[in-house]
Amino acid sequence: MHQYHDLLERILSDGAQKHDRTGTGTLSVFGHQMRFNLAAGFPMVTTKRLPLKAIVHELLWFLKGDTNIKYLHDHGVTIWDEWADANGDLGPVYGYQWRSWPTSDGGQIDQISNVVDMIRRNPDSRRLIVTAWNPADVEKMALPPCHCLFQFYVANGKLSCQLYQRSADVFLGVPFNIASYALLTMMVAQVTGLKLGEFVHSFGDVHLYSNHIEQARLQLSRTPRPLPTMTLNPDVKDIFAFRYEDFALAGYDPHPHIKAEVAV
């Protein structure tokens, strides 16, 4: 995962000091890209431990089209608690836009179903896109989408995915996002009968919060270990049929967790 360490080092050396919505302050760079060959191992950061359960359940929650944290709580995941209202609702965030994008005539668009179907029918299409950034709904969301648009690409029987992330918390969020979208790409590849290509992660404002600087330096002092492997249950052929038990991570031997406070 040298790509991630290179990004941390770039921000520490070249980042501009900026104010931000949370009042914490950041070091920030604008425009960066990382590439991961998904056939070479599952891109899960090894220089600190990541919570696989939270990564998988959040992705399954998105794919359900859910926007209430009850499902997450039922599975012991609390990563969205700071933004939910008293009823556990978050407004029309990721899952709603992915599965139920509202149309002007009162209908809804299931972008996930559409993109999977299009990959099967027309893999050379340049319209294999899902977006969570809906300007009409942004003000209704507890937190506007940070990872806001992704595009699939098929070549030589391999599926790749590129994510555009407008805003990225490099210490807490980015390792999580890498693993989540790598996993989504694996799932889509399986249900469309394709091999694995690349996950390409493109950023707008990628930043290190001022209260994460020492943690980032600690992480950079650690030597990355071999990437783990992720195996999916080969019997699952429907993107919406995956369950937590269908994912098996092997060979994950990370350095210890590094505690850091989330900026709300």
Swiss-Prot record:
Its EC number(s): 2.1.1.45
Residues that coordinate or bind (6R)-5,10-methylene-5,6,7,8-tetrahydrofolate: 169, 263
Catalytic activity field: dUMP + (6R)-5,10-methylene-5,6,7,8-tetrahydrofolate = 7,8-dihydrofolate + dTMP
Pathway: Pyrimidine metabolism; dTTP biosynthesis
Alphabetical UniProt keywords: Cytoplasm, Methyltransferase, Nucleotide biosynthesis, Transferase
Positions contributing to dUMP binding: 21, 126-127, 166-169, 177, 207-209
Lineage top rank: taxon: Bacteria
Protein name per Swiss-Prot or TrEMBL: Thymidylate synthase
Source organism of the structure: Bradyrhizobium sp. (strain ORS 278)
Gene that specifies this protein: thyA
